Amino acid sequence: VRGSPRRPGNAENTGENREGPAMRTTIDFRTLATAAGALALSLAAVLPAAADGEVNIYSYRQPDLIKPLLDKFTAETGIQTNVVSASSGLEERIAAEGANSPADVILSVDIGRLDGAKQLGITQAVASPTIDANVPAQYRDPEGHWVGLTMRARVVYASKDRVAQDTITYEDLADPKWKGKICTRSGQHVYNIGLFASLIANDGADKAEETIKGIKENLAVKPAGGDRDQAKAILAGECDLALGNTYYVGLMQTNEKEPEQKEWAKAIKVLFPNADGRGTHVNISGAALAKNAPNRDNAVKLIEFLTSDEAQEIYADSNFEYPVKPGLEVNEIIASWGALKPDPLPLATIAADRKQASEIVDKVGYDDGPSS
Protein backbone atom coordinates (compact mmCIF):
# COMPACT_ATOMS: atom_id res chain seq x y z
CA VAL A 1 0.00 0.00 0.00
CA ARG A 2 1.36 3.39 -1.02
CA GLY A 3 0.53 6.86 0.22
CA SER A 4 -1.94 9.27 -1.28
CA PRO A 5 -2.09 9.26 -5.09
CA ARG A 6 -0.25 11.70 -7.27
CA ARG A 7 -3.16 13.87 -8.29
CA PRO A 8 -3.31 15.64 -11.68
CA GLY A 9 -5.00 18.68 -10.16
CA ASN A 10 -8.75 18.80 -9.62
CA ALA A 11 -9.92 18.40 -13.20
CA GLU A 12 -10.91 14.80 -12.56
CA ASN A 13 -12.84 15.67 -9.44
CA THR A 14 -15.74 17.38 -11.17
CA GLY A 15 -18.30 16.17 -13.64
CA GLU A 16 -19.89 12.74 -13.50
CA ASN A 17 -19.45 11.95 -17.17
CA ARG A 18 -15.93 13.13 -17.84
CA GLU A 19 -15.36 9.85 -19.69
CA GLY A 20 -18.36 10.28 -21.93
CA PRO A 21 -22.11 10.51 -21.57
CA ALA A 22 -24.55 7.70 -21.04
CA MET A 23 -24.92 5.84 -24.28
CA ARG A 24 -26.47 2.85 -25.96
CA THR A 25 -24.14 -0.08 -26.11
CA THR A 26 -23.92 -0.67 -29.83
CA ILE A 27 -22.71 1.50 -32.69
CA ASP A 28 -25.47 2.52 -35.09
CA PHE A 29 -23.87 1.58 -38.39
CA ARG A 30 -26.85 2.93 -40.35
CA THR A 31 -25.97 6.50 -39.41
CA LEU A 32 -22.22 6.05 -39.26
CA ALA A 33 -21.44 7.49 -42.66
CA THR A 34 -23.36 10.71 -42.02
CA ALA A 35 -21.97 11.18 -38.52
CA ALA A 36 -18.46 10.32 -39.58
CA GLY A 37 -18.51 12.81 -42.42
CA ALA A 38 -19.65 15.60 -40.17
CA LEU A 39 -17.02 14.79 -37.59
CA ALA A 40 -14.29 14.70 -40.18
CA LEU A 41 -15.22 18.15 -41.44
CA SER A 42 -15.64 19.73 -38.02
CA LEU A 43 -12.51 18.26 -36.48
CA ALA A 44 -10.16 18.19 -39.45
CA ALA A 45 -6.55 19.28 -39.17
CA VAL A 46 -6.29 19.12 -35.39
CA LEU A 47 -3.27 16.83 -35.50
CA PRO A 48 -0.16 17.34 -37.60
CA ALA A 49 0.85 15.00 -40.38
CA ALA A 50 3.13 12.10 -39.59
CA ALA A 51 6.66 13.06 -38.59
CA ASP A 52 9.63 11.23 -37.16
CA GLY A 53 9.74 11.01 -33.41
CA GLU A 54 6.07 11.55 -32.55
CA VAL A 55 2.90 9.64 -31.77
CA ASN A 56 -0.68 10.85 -32.24
CA ILE A 57 -3.21 9.90 -29.58
CA TYR A 58 -7.01 10.02 -29.79
CA SER A 59 -8.16 9.94 -26.19
CA TYR A 60 -11.33 9.59 -24.16
CA ARG A 61 -9.27 10.19 -21.02
CA GLN A 62 -9.03 13.73 -19.67
CA PRO A 63 -5.79 15.53 -20.65
CA ASP A 64 -4.76 16.19 -17.04
CA LEU A 65 -5.10 12.49 -16.29
CA ILE A 66 -2.69 11.30 -18.97
CA LYS A 67 -0.27 14.24 -19.16
CA PRO A 68 2.09 12.99 -16.41
CA LEU A 69 2.41 9.66 -18.19
CA LEU A 70 2.95 11.17 -21.61
CA ASP A 71 5.55 13.60 -20.25
CA LYS A 72 7.42 10.68 -18.70
CA PHE A 73 7.20 8.71 -21.94
CA THR A 74 8.68 11.63 -23.88
CA ALA A 75 11.43 12.09 -21.29
CA GLU A 76 12.42 8.44 -21.56
CA THR A 77 12.12 7.97 -25.33
CA GLY A 78 12.36 11.42 -26.92
CA ILE A 79 9.09 10.70 -28.76
CA GLN A 80 6.73 13.67 -28.74
CA THR A 81 3.03 13.11 -28.09
CA ASN A 82 0.09 14.89 -29.74
CA VAL A 83 -3.34 14.43 -28.17
CA VAL A 84 -6.90 14.94 -29.36
CA SER A 85 -9.39 14.54 -26.50
CA ALA A 86 -13.14 14.07 -26.80
CA SER A 87 -16.05 12.66 -24.83
CA SER A 88 -17.57 10.90 -27.85
CA GLY A 89 -17.20 10.40 -31.58
CA LEU A 90 -13.54 9.42 -31.88
CA GLU A 91 -14.28 6.05 -33.47
CA GLU A 92 -16.46 7.68 -36.11
CA ARG A 93 -13.82 10.30 -36.77
CA ILE A 94 -11.11 7.70 -37.34
CA ALA A 95 -13.43 5.75 -39.63
CA ALA A 96 -14.14 8.91 -41.64
CA GLU A 97 -10.46 9.77 -41.93
CA GLY A 98 -9.78 6.33 -43.38
CA ALA A 99 -6.30 5.61 -44.68
CA ASN A 100 -5.29 9.23 -44.12
CA SER A 101 -6.06 9.21 -40.41
CA PRO A 102 -3.20 10.56 -38.29
CA ALA A 103 -4.38 8.49 -35.30
CA ASP A 104 -1.76 6.14 -33.90
CA VAL A 105 -3.14 5.16 -30.48
CA ILE A 106 -6.69 5.13 -29.14
CA LEU A 107 -7.04 5.57 -25.37
CA SER A 108 -10.49 4.59 -24.23
CA VAL A 109 -12.63 3.48 -21.31
CA ASP A 110 -14.95 0.49 -21.07
CA ILE A 111 -14.61 -2.80 -22.88
CA GLY A 112 -17.61 -1.87 -25.02
CA ARG A 113 -15.83 1.07 -26.59
CA LEU A 114 -12.59 -0.82 -27.09
CA ASP A 115 -14.27 -3.82 -28.67
CA GLY A 116 -16.54 -1.50 -30.63
CA ALA A 117 -13.48 0.11 -32.21
CA LYS A 118 -12.25 -3.33 -33.19
CA GLN A 119 -15.61 -4.28 -34.70
CA LEU A 120 -15.66 -1.01 -36.62
CA GLY A 121 -12.39 -2.02 -38.28
CA ILE A 122 -10.32 0.94 -37.07
CA THR A 123 -7.75 -1.02 -35.03
CA GLN A 124 -4.98 -3.46 -35.81
CA ALA A 125 -3.35 -6.29 -33.93
CA VAL A 126 -0.23 -5.81 -31.83
CA ALA A 127 2.09 -8.73 -31.16
CA SER A 128 4.28 -7.73 -28.22
CA PRO A 129 5.96 -10.04 -25.70
CA THR A 130 6.24 -7.01 -23.38
CA ILE A 131 2.49 -6.42 -23.37
CA ASP A 132 1.75 -10.12 -23.01
CA ALA A 133 4.07 -10.32 -20.00
CA ASN A 134 2.61 -7.25 -18.32
CA VAL A 135 -1.12 -7.71 -18.90
CA PRO A 136 -3.01 -10.91 -18.01
CA ALA A 137 -4.79 -12.56 -20.94
CA GLN A 138 -8.26 -11.83 -19.54
CA TYR A 139 -7.60 -8.10 -20.00
CA ARG A 140 -6.35 -8.39 -23.58
CA ASP A 141 -8.13 -8.97 -26.86
CA PRO A 142 -7.42 -12.56 -27.98
CA GLU A 143 -6.44 -11.20 -31.39
CA GLY A 144 -4.31 -8.36 -30.00
CA HIS A 145 -6.55 -5.43 -30.98
CA TRP A 146 -6.85 -3.87 -27.51
CA VAL A 147 -5.17 -4.10 -24.14
CA GLY A 148 -6.30 -3.12 -20.66
CA LEU A 149 -4.27 -0.60 -18.67
CA THR A 150 -6.30 -0.05 -15.50
CA MET A 151 -9.29 -1.70 -13.82
CA ARG A 152 -12.37 -0.35 -12.11
CA ALA A 153 -14.75 -2.57 -10.15
CA ARG A 154 -18.55 -2.30 -10.32
CA VAL A 155 -19.44 -2.50 -6.65
CA VAL A 156 -22.35 -1.89 -4.31
CA TYR A 157 -22.50 1.39 -2.42
CA ALA A 158 -24.28 0.58 0.86
CA SER A 159 -25.56 2.90 3.57
CA LYS A 160 -23.27 2.76 6.59
CA ASP A 161 -26.22 3.50 8.86
CA ARG A 162 -28.94 1.29 7.39
CA VAL A 163 -27.16 -1.75 5.92
CA ALA A 164 -25.53 -4.03 8.48
CA GLN A 165 -24.18 -6.72 6.19
CA ASP A 166 -20.70 -6.50 4.72
CA THR A 167 -21.06 -9.17 2.01
CA ILE A 168 -23.42 -9.36 -0.94
CA THR A 169 -23.75 -10.80 -4.43
CA TYR A 170 -25.12 -9.19 -7.57
CA GLU A 171 -27.82 -11.82 -7.53
CA ASP A 172 -28.80 -10.80 -3.98
CA LEU A 173 -29.87 -7.41 -5.30
CA ALA A 174 -32.92 -9.10 -6.83
CA ASP A 175 -34.11 -10.32 -3.41
CA PRO A 176 -37.53 -8.79 -2.59
CA LYS A 177 -36.18 -7.74 0.82
CA TRP A 178 -34.49 -4.84 -1.01
CA LYS A 179 -37.73 -3.62 -2.61
CA GLY A 180 -37.71 0.16 -2.78
CA LYS A 181 -34.15 0.36 -1.48
CA ILE A 182 -31.92 0.35 -4.60
CA CYS A 183 -30.80 3.25 -6.80
CA THR A 184 -28.88 3.05 -10.08
CA ARG A 185 -28.11 5.08 -13.14
CA SER A 186 -29.62 4.01 -16.49
CA GLY A 187 -29.53 0.30 -17.17
CA GLN A 188 -28.38 1.14 -20.69
CA HIS A 189 -25.30 2.99 -19.49
CA VAL A 190 -22.11 1.23 -20.56
CA TYR A 191 -21.10 0.57 -16.95
CA ASN A 192 -24.30 -1.34 -16.19
CA ILE A 193 -24.39 -3.09 -19.55
CA GLY A 194 -20.91 -4.45 -18.85
CA LEU A 195 -22.07 -5.75 -15.48
CA PHE A 196 -25.24 -7.28 -16.90
CA ALA A 197 -23.22 -8.92 -19.68
CA SER A 198 -21.05 -10.53 -17.01
CA LEU A 199 -24.20 -11.93 -15.40
CA ILE A 200 -25.14 -13.53 -18.72
CA ALA A 201 -21.69 -15.05 -19.07
CA ASN A 202 -21.58 -16.34 -15.49
CA ASP A 203 -25.20 -17.29 -14.80
CA GLY A 204 -26.75 -17.84 -18.22
CA ALA A 205 -29.20 -15.56 -20.00
CA ASP A 206 -32.33 -16.77 -18.20
CA LYS A 207 -30.90 -16.31 -14.71
CA ALA A 208 -29.35 -12.98 -15.70
CA GLU A 209 -32.72 -11.72 -16.95
CA GLU A 210 -34.32 -12.81 -13.69
CA THR A 211 -31.69 -10.89 -11.73
CA ILE A 212 -31.94 -7.75 -13.86
CA LYS A 213 -35.73 -7.78 -13.60
CA GLY A 214 -35.49 -8.31 -9.84
CA ILE A 215 -33.15 -5.34 -9.44
CA LYS A 216 -35.53 -3.25 -11.52
CA GLU A 217 -38.44 -4.15 -9.26
CA ASN A 218 -36.36 -3.24 -6.19
CA LEU A 219 -35.53 0.25 -7.45
CA ALA A 220 -36.58 3.11 -5.21
CA VAL A 221 -36.93 5.49 -8.13
CA LYS A 222 -36.58 5.51 -11.90
CA PRO A 223 -32.90 5.21 -12.91
CA ALA A 224 -31.27 8.62 -13.29
CA GLY A 225 -28.03 10.53 -12.85
CA GLY A 226 -24.55 9.11 -12.55
CA ASP A 227 -22.80 6.92 -10.01
CA ARG A 228 -22.07 9.79 -7.64
CA ASP A 229 -25.74 10.79 -7.68
CA GLN A 230 -26.56 7.38 -6.23
CA ALA A 231 -24.26 8.01 -3.25
CA LYS A 232 -25.97 11.37 -2.78
CA ALA A 233 -29.34 9.59 -2.78
CA ILE A 234 -28.13 7.18 -0.10
CA LEU A 235 -27.09 10.09 2.12
CA ALA A 236 -30.53 11.63 1.58
CA GLY A 237 -32.21 8.39 2.64
CA GLU A 238 -33.79 7.81 -0.76
CA CYS A 239 -32.25 4.33 -1.03
CA ASP A 240 -29.92 2.02 0.88
CA LEU A 241 -27.97 0.33 -1.92
CA ALA A 242 -26.62 1.44 -5.28
CA LEU A 243 -24.40 0.20 -8.07
CA GLY A 244 -21.28 2.29 -8.69
CA ASN A 245 -17.70 2.19 -9.90
CA THR A 246 -14.97 2.14 -7.29
CA TYR A 247 -13.03 5.15 -8.53
CA TYR A 248 -15.97 7.48 -7.97
CA VAL A 249 -15.61 6.79 -4.25
CA GLY A 250 -12.05 8.10 -4.32
CA LEU A 251 -13.06 11.10 -6.41
CA MET A 252 -15.79 11.96 -3.91
CA GLN A 253 -13.51 11.46 -0.91
CA THR A 254 -10.92 13.90 -2.27
CA ASN A 255 -13.15 16.45 -3.99
CA GLU A 256 -12.02 19.90 -2.83
CA LYS A 257 -13.97 21.83 -5.47
CA GLU A 258 -17.28 20.28 -4.42
CA PRO A 259 -16.74 19.32 -0.78
CA GLU A 260 -20.34 18.21 -0.37
CA GLN A 261 -19.30 15.10 -2.25
CA LYS A 262 -17.11 14.15 0.69
CA GLU A 263 -20.31 13.85 2.73
CA TRP A 264 -21.81 11.58 0.09
CA ALA A 265 -18.76 9.34 0.36
CA LYS A 266 -18.91 9.29 4.16
CA ALA A 267 -22.47 7.97 3.98
CA ILE A 268 -21.52 4.79 2.12
CA LYS A 269 -19.38 1.72 2.49
CA VAL A 270 -18.05 -0.30 -0.43
CA LEU A 271 -19.25 -3.89 -0.78
CA PHE A 272 -17.42 -6.07 -3.30
CA PRO A 273 -20.12 -8.37 -4.72
CA ASN A 274 -19.43 -12.09 -5.09
CA ALA A 275 -16.12 -11.71 -3.25
CA ASP A 276 -16.64 -15.11 -1.64
CA GLY A 277 -17.40 -16.70 -5.00
CA ARG A 278 -16.36 -15.92 -8.55
CA GLY A 279 -15.24 -12.39 -7.73
CA THR A 280 -16.38 -8.86 -8.52
CA HIS A 281 -17.07 -7.62 -12.04
CA VAL A 282 -14.33 -5.34 -13.36
CA ASN A 283 -14.05 -3.20 -16.45
CA ILE A 284 -11.01 -1.47 -17.90
CA SER A 285 -9.51 1.58 -19.42
CA GLY A 286 -7.29 0.55 -22.27
CA ALA A 287 -5.43 1.25 -25.48
CA ALA A 288 -5.63 0.15 -29.09
CA LEU A 289 -3.37 0.62 -32.10
CA ALA A 290 -5.13 2.50 -34.89
CA LYS A 291 -5.46 0.59 -38.16
CA ASN A 292 -3.63 3.15 -40.29
CA ALA A 293 -1.20 4.42 -37.67
CA PRO A 294 1.45 6.49 -39.49
CA ASN A 295 3.84 6.15 -36.53
CA ARG A 296 3.26 2.48 -35.80
CA ASP A 297 6.56 1.70 -34.09
CA ASN A 298 6.25 4.70 -31.79
CA ALA A 299 2.65 3.77 -31.04
CA VAL A 300 3.64 0.26 -29.99
CA LYS A 301 6.38 1.72 -27.80
CA LEU A 302 3.81 3.94 -26.09
CA ILE A 303 1.39 1.09 -25.45
CA GLU A 304 4.23 -1.04 -24.09
CA PHE A 305 5.26 1.84 -21.84
CA LEU A 306 1.71 2.23 -20.54
CA THR A 307 1.72 -1.43 -19.45
CA SER A 308 4.92 -1.03 -17.42
CA ASP A 309 4.77 -1.27 -13.63
CA GLU A 310 5.47 2.39 -12.94
CA ALA A 311 3.14 3.67 -15.65
CA GLN A 312 0.30 1.44 -14.46
CA GLU A 313 0.74 2.64 -10.89
CA ILE A 314 0.76 6.31 -11.93
CA TYR A 315 -2.19 5.83 -14.29
CA ALA A 316 -4.21 3.91 -11.70
CA ASP A 317 -3.37 6.29 -8.84
CA SER A 318 -4.43 9.38 -10.74
CA ASN A 319 -8.03 8.18 -11.04
CA PHE A 320 -8.32 5.76 -8.10
CA GLU A 321 -8.23 2.71 -10.35
CA TYR A 322 -6.44 -0.63 -10.07
CA PRO A 323 -3.44 -1.71 -12.18
CA VAL A 324 -4.29 -4.67 -14.39
CA LYS A 325 -0.97 -6.32 -13.60
CA PRO A 326 -1.23 -8.48 -10.47
CA GLY A 327 1.06 -7.73 -7.55
CA LEU A 328 1.33 -3.97 -7.98
CA GLU A 329 0.47 -1.90 -4.93
CA VAL A 330 -2.52 0.41 -4.72
CA ASN A 331 -2.63 3.66 -2.80
CA GLU A 332 -3.98 3.88 0.73
CA ILE A 333 -7.37 5.30 -0.26
CA ILE A 334 -8.10 2.39 -2.59
CA ALA A 335 -6.81 -0.08 -0.01
CA SER A 336 -9.17 1.37 2.60
CA TRP A 337 -12.19 0.07 0.69
CA GLY A 338 -11.13 -3.55 1.15
CA ALA A 339 -9.60 -6.28 -0.98
CA LEU A 340 -10.68 -6.68 -4.59
CA LYS A 341 -11.02 -10.20 -5.99
CA PRO A 342 -11.65 -9.65 -9.71
CA ASP A 343 -13.97 -11.95 -11.62
CA PRO A 344 -11.58 -13.91 -13.90
CA LEU A 345 -14.04 -13.81 -16.79
CA PRO A 346 -12.25 -12.64 -19.97
CA LEU A 347 -13.44 -9.19 -20.94
CA ALA A 348 -13.76 -10.33 -24.54
CA THR A 349 -16.52 -12.66 -23.34
CA ILE A 350 -18.29 -9.75 -21.68
CA ALA A 351 -18.01 -7.75 -24.89
CA ALA A 352 -19.67 -10.56 -26.81
CA ASP A 353 -22.67 -10.57 -24.44
CA ARG A 354 -23.24 -6.81 -24.35
CA LYS A 355 -25.83 -6.76 -27.13
CA GLN A 356 -27.95 -9.38 -25.39
CA ALA A 357 -27.59 -7.51 -22.10
CA SER A 358 -28.91 -4.35 -23.74
CA GLU A 359 -31.85 -6.27 -25.16
CA ILE A 360 -32.71 -7.69 -21.73
CA VAL A 361 -32.60 -4.21 -20.18
CA ASP A 362 -35.16 -3.08 -22.74
CA LYS A 363 -37.22 -6.26 -22.41
CA VAL A 364 -37.72 -5.92 -18.65
CA GLY A 365 -38.28 -2.16 -18.88
CA TYR A 366 -35.41 -1.44 -16.50
CA ASP A 367 -35.22 2.27 -17.20
CA ASP A 368 -38.96 2.64 -16.59
CA GLY A 369 -38.33 1.97 -12.91
CA PRO A 370 -40.28 -0.33 -10.59
CA SER A 371 -43.72 -1.57 -11.61
CA SER A 372 -45.28 -0.39 -8.37
Which sequence ranges carry the predicted segments?
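Short helix-loop capping/hinge motifs at secondary-structure junctions, enriched
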Residues: D161-I168, A201-E209, A293-A299
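Ligand-binding pocket segment of bilobal, Venus flytrap-like solute-binding proteins
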Residues: Y191, S198, D203-P273
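Conserved C-terminal helix/tail region of periplasmic/extracytoplasmic solute-binding proteins
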Residues: D343-S372
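Early extracytoplasmic/lumenal segment of secretory-pathway proteins
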Residues: D52-D115
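Short beta-strand->loop
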Residues: Y58-R61, P142-E143, A158-K160, Q165, ...
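Periplasmic-binding protein-like
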Residues: G180-Q188, F305-E329
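A bilobed periplasmic-binding-protein/Venus flytrap-type ligand-binding module shared by bacterial periplasmic
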Residues: Y157-R162, A197, V282-N295, I314-Y315
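A structural signal for short loop-to-beta-strand junctions that line the ligand-binding cleft
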Residues: S101-I106, Q124-V156, E171, I182-T184
